[in-house]
């Protein structure tokens, strides 16, 4: 069994450059399709990032609606698995001491962040459908 795991690991490493390039291509496509939407803020990747997703801040509107969750729900209804970007450690029950300074910006925006898929298996037709749904729901 160890040989099988080793073979899988070697294959993944051999294709790493190809996978990163494919992910970056999808990030560029999201930037082209969603970059002009004033209801969204695409979080840029740092130079050399191998991020698996495109993180997007869905800017809240006036009122109490959770627009980011509406985007996630609409994508889920269309068959796409998308979720919030992260939950700050200090907000997880039992980990409230995992913050050394207050994080007002993170505390304010974390619930607005979602991750859009960028994996090599994501076809550009699906990427365009995802972008269309995100655009429509975020714009309202």
Where are these regions (language model features)?
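PLP-dependent aminotransferase class I/II
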Residues: 1-140
């Amino acid at each position: 069994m160890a040989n099988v795991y080793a073979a899988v690991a070697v294959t993944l490493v051999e294709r790493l450059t190809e996978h990163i390039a494919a992910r970056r291509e999808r990030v560029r496509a999201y930037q082209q399709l969603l970059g002009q939407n004033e209801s969204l803020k695409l979080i840029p990747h740092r130079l050399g990032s191998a991020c698996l997703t495109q993180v997007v801040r869905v800017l809240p509107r006036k009122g109490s609606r959770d627009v980011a969750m509406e985007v996630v729900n609409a994508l889920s209804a269309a068959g796409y698995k998308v979720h919030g970007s992260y939950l700050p450690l200090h907000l997880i029950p039992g980990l409230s001491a995992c913050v050394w300074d207050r994080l007002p910006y993170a505390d304010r925006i974390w619930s607005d962040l979602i991750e859009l898929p960028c994996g090599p298996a994501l076809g550009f037709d699906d990427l365009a459908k995802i972008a269309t749904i995100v655009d429509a729901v975020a714009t309202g």
